[in-house]
Amino acid sequence: MACCIPDELKEQKRINQEIERQLKRDKRDARRELKLLLLGTGESGKSTFIKQMRIIHGAGYSDEDKRSHIKIVYQNIFMAMHAMIRAMDTLNIQYINPANRENGNMIRQIDYETVTTFDKPCVDAIISLWNDDGIQECYDRRREYQLTDSAKYYLDSVERISQQDYLPTLQDILRVRVPTTGIIEYPFDLDSIIFRMVDVGGQRSERRKWIHCFENVTSIMFLVALSEYDQVLVESDNENRMEESKALFRTIITYPWFQNSSVILFLNKKDLLEEKIMHSHLVDYFPEFDGPKKEASTAREFILKMFVELNPDPDKIIYSHFTCATDTENIRFVFAAVKDTILQLNLKEYNLV
């Protein structure tokens, strides 16, 4: 019997070693998932970024997926026109074509959240309204009320969108606005590593739900809409949107949960900034700006500096990119750089070497 003991011990040792190896494998496999938390205020472009990941690194959008967006595109058109019709009254702007007052009343009576079709009377009314110089003046003053960024894109495309065989394009899907409520996760596989992107609602009422997402975050991806420097909040019409974004960024980067998470700052909507800066001057909203007017590159560098200076930790690097979330090639290029940054920072932690 005594001679068997060493063999039993050997077998026990072998089993223990195998268990240890399996535990290490499990730990390694668990760590091959990177959690990327998308944060930012409402309408900064987080949901559009997720859609781009689906197009670039996922299955994309089938014809059935595209068809499921038809009524949401219709609703976005009605929602935009509703906002402008209301603003015509509040801003005291007159329709140039008197018939458009009646068209406005007709569209106003339709609850845009229940729209599922796009009938000819509505199509004709919306086209007539959009071509009215009064509505165009109202559109030019859009910073004085709440209007979605995609309003012009859709209203310029009403004839195409109203066709019976209409199938939304990828650009139509990217630009559609549906406020994120709750938490949306989108996992995708890249080079045998799972990137789990988590999008949370940006409006104030949604932010209390973020706390559940804070564990094991590899990287914070914080989106800022560059074009919001002259806009006010949906929730409060006397608070500047960019100031709100700065306050949120300051809070996020000082959270103890994110002490070991890398921070990547996306200064988004650079295309809208380039349009807007020609007639809306940054210095009117941020008096400390001393650069030239009508120069987008100087304006965006100033905005970047404002955010980077909110970082209290001199050892923490804020990685930054200027983006246009509706431009697939731009996001493809930027995310390739982001992926490399994240992997470089996590080589040892995630057993990638």
Curated annotation (Swiss-Prot):
Name listed for the protein in its UniProt record: Guanine nucleotide-binding protein G(q) subunit alpha
Region listing for G5 motif, in residue ranges: 323-328
Region feature (G3 motif): 195-204
Organism, scientific name: Lymnaea stagnalis (Great pond snail)
Role according to the record: Guanine nucleotide-binding proteins (G proteins) are involved as modulators or transducers in various transmembrane signaling systems.
Renumbered residue ranges of the record's region G2 motif: 172-180
Binding, Mg(2+): S47, T180
Lipidation (S-palmitoyl cysteine): C3, C4
Region spans: G1 motif: 35-48
Domain G-alpha intervals: 32-353
One annotated Gene Ontology cellular component of this protein: heterotrimeric G-protein complex
Keyword set includes Chloroplast: no
